[in-house]
Amino acid sequence: MRKLALVPIQFYRYAISPLMASHCRFYPSCSCYAYEAIENHGLLRGGWLAVRRLGRCHPWNDGGFDPVPPAPSSRTSSIAE
């Protein structure tokens, strides 16, 4: 399911985005952010992170560097230490 959700993002990145002028206020771009978020966090959490990012992409936001948050580590590794 995750790979299926990434197909439209890849299509946008490689077929539509090059035809448009670069308008993204953030680094990485919103499409790269969405791809990485879904890849690292899964469809639900990654999709939610992507929607939140798109909500921040507007003229009143300065933008800048906004990386995908790291995936939560396993709780068992912190208990074992």
From Swiss-Prot:
Keyword Magnesium assigned: no
Organism this protein belongs to: Pseudomonas entomophila (strain L48)
Protein role: Could be involved in insertion of integral membrane proteins into the membrane.
Classification lineage: Bacteria, Pseudomonadati, Pseudomonadota, Gammaproteobacteria, Pseudomonadales
Name the record gives this protein: Putative membrane protein insertion efficiency factor
NCBIfam families in alphabetical order: membrane protein insertion efficiency factor YidD (TIGR00278)
Key words, A-Z: Cell inner membrane, Cell membrane, Membrane
GO cellular component: plasma membrane
Signal peptide: none
Family recorded in the similarity comment: Belongs to the UPF0161 family.
Topology of this chain in the membrane: Peripheral membrane protein
InterPro entries named among the record's database cross-references: Membr_insert_effic_factor_YidD (IPR002696)
Pfam family, one: YidD
SMART domains in UniProt: Haemolytic
Subcellular location, record wording: Cell inner membrane
Domain of life per record: Bacteria
